[in-house]
Amino acid sequence: MTNVGDQGVDAVFGVIYPPQVALVSFGKPAQRVCAVDGAIHVMTTVLATLPADHGCSDDHRGALFFLSINELTRCAAVTG
């Protein structure tokens, strides 16, 4: 994992080197306009990227990972 958001970077696209199989990266949190259930909201979002070795995994696993992160952060925003 790499996090350059604290340095003001919006997004980073990491490069993996064998034997690495993936690298998740997070950019800086920012207020963005989002549509939720047909309504417009201003929400704090973070851009995340996940370069991966497709010989070891596939896009489906990456999508499941991001869905989990999305659910965890939504729950934290509601309860926090």
UniProtKB/Swiss-Prot annotation:
Species name:
Mycobacterium tuberculosis (strain CDC 1551 / Oshkosh)
Q: What induces it?
A: A member of the dormancy regulon. Induced in response to reduced oxygen tension (hypoxia) and low levels of nitric oxide (NO).
Q: Which domain of life is it from?
A: Bacteria
Q: Which Pfam families match?
A: 2-oxoacid_dh
Give the family per the record.
Belongs to the 2-oxoacid dehydrogenase family.
Q: What is this protein called?
A: Uncharacterized protein MT1774.1
GO-annotated molecular function: acyltransferase activity
